[in-house]
């Protein structure tokens, strides 16, 4: 689906954060979620949907069970700073495995900060209010 991204005033001139995470358990299970694959998927999606100023935030080898991850924390800091207008992830499980924390970030924190959120594989786009319909994959 190719569509031109209409930039809102809130996300105009702000970074598009591409967030990747892979835990050691994911890697050992042979999942096709390698960091390289996630980066390519996120870049392809962002470019085909008109997102610009792409910046990767990566946590390789970190569990989604906690949110004390360097890439995640750096991204949150830049959201607080007002530098990031959009966050794109492969799927909701890349954000984390704790349903309450994921819900807080996607439904409260990002919205309060005026950050547009997209989870590609889950069909989540906060601009069209799909967040509350999604279950995080285990």
PLM regions with names:
Residues 1-137:
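Short, structured surface patches at the beginning of a domain
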């Amino acid at each position: 689906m190719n569509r031109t991204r209409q930039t809102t005033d809130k996300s105009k001139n702000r970074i598009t954060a591409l967030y990747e995470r892979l835990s050691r358990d994911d890697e050992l299970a042979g999942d096709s979620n390698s960091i390289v694959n996630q980066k390519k998927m996120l870049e392809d999606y962002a470019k085909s949907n008109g997102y610009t100023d792409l910046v990767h935030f990566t946590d390789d080898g970190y569990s989604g069970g906690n949110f004390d991850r360097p890439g995640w924390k750096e991204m949150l800091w830049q959201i607080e700073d007002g530098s990031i207008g959009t966050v794109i992830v492969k799927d909701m499980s890349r954000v984390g495995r704790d349903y309450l924390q994921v819900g807080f970030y996607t439904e409260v924190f990002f919205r309060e900060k005026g950050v547009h959120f997209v989870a590609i594989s889950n069909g989540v786009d906060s601009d069209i209010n799909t967040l509350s319909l999604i279950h995080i994959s285990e």
